Curated annotation (Swiss-Prot):
Sites where the protein binds [2Fe-2S] cluster: 334
InterPro entries: Aminotrans_V_dom, Aminotrans_V_PyrdxlP_BS, Cys_deSase_IscS, Cysteine_dSase, PyrdxlP-dep_Trfase, PyrdxlP-dep_Trfase_major, PyrdxlP-dep_Trfase_small
Gene it is expressed from: iscS
Ligand binding (pyridoxal 5'-phosphate): 80-81, 160, 188, 208-210, 248
Protein name stated in the entry: Cysteine desulfurase IscS
Protein's organism: Rickettsia peacockii (strain Rustic)
Domain of life, per lineage: Bacteria
Amino acid sequence: MNPQLNNLTLPIYMDYQATTPIDPRVMEAMLPYFTTKFGNPHSRSHSFGWEAENAVEEARSMVAKLIGADTKEIIFTSGATESNNLAIKGIAKFYSNKKNHIITVVSEHKCVLDACRHLEQEGIKITYLPIKPNGIIDLETLKNAITDQTMLVSVMVVNNEIGVVQPLKEIGKICREKGVFFHSDIAQGFGKIPIDVNAFNIDLASISGHKIYGPKGIGALYVRKKPRVRVTPLINGGGQERGMRSGTLPTPLIVGLGMAAEIAYSEMEKDTKHVNYLFDRFLNNIHKRISEVYLNGDKNQRYKGNLNLSFAGVEGESMILAIKDLAVSSGSACTSASLEPSYVLRSMGIGEELAHTAIRFGIGRFTTEQEVDYAVNLICSKIDKLRALSPLWEMMQEGIDLKKIKWAVH
């Protein structure tokens, strides 16, 4: 049983970039498809199959509507990791006899970077674009990196670690002018910020259900039909999903993703106001009470549900232990098992000592003002205690530049 404090249930969930709780309305929509409406959506000879197929197609149209796509352009997958792999490897395999170059960014999600490294072993040339100190790519650098051999540019919309929003419209315009396919991992932005695949000239986009208050184990890949984009499938079988992703579709999960998309479509403005208000309250109150706290990533060009903060003079892991009443992360959930400082922060040029102090706080639909105030009070009290114990903080206060110290190795 979770302890309660003035109607506040502890621990407080603040890791919305790792996953989100299922919205009760999503759960309600899914339940019948686990029980009475259990048909296979590919069974065309009876009403159980028709009922499931109708539910799948309705969900498909809900997902498409949220990004301005055509219903037929949505391919269901197991999640954004599979979608990213299908997009990047699928394009590379289909077009490798014509072109052999892909461009991505050093701060992409690990599954994009690993898919690209896999392709490098198969002879595809990969360019990893740097990011500026604010976490955003430089558009001129992108333009200059595109050659006549470039088949794909892959840039995520919202970074999972630092929350910065890349200029997708400008990137899409460059790609279209140069005749290069544009893929975006939109898992952290789908349903949270306005995304229009046509206005942004996006050719492929990866979507995840559990980042928008839907179930885990379901995602989608948007694949443009006009001009047509071709991908070689990763999974062979019955030819479902326009031949791009074989396997029986999990109707309950798809219904959940569809309902989550429908809610996001109708409530995006309300959610955005809520998240922006709590972000400003959290950050302003932290800055009023503690010195040398740094927001990682551009303050304005970002999704404000993500607060990645560095607390100078405090080790991030010790901070997480000290604030165990808050469920937070010191990196992306896929890489936070490692004690290495975040590769995203390091690629922004942030020094190792500050990168090690970074903690990501996630704010979402179900975060309350009371939870944010409790979090701020807890953080401030623990920071003061940890800094009082920290020889590094003492040295910094004495004006010693930690970058210039040569540490002895025992």
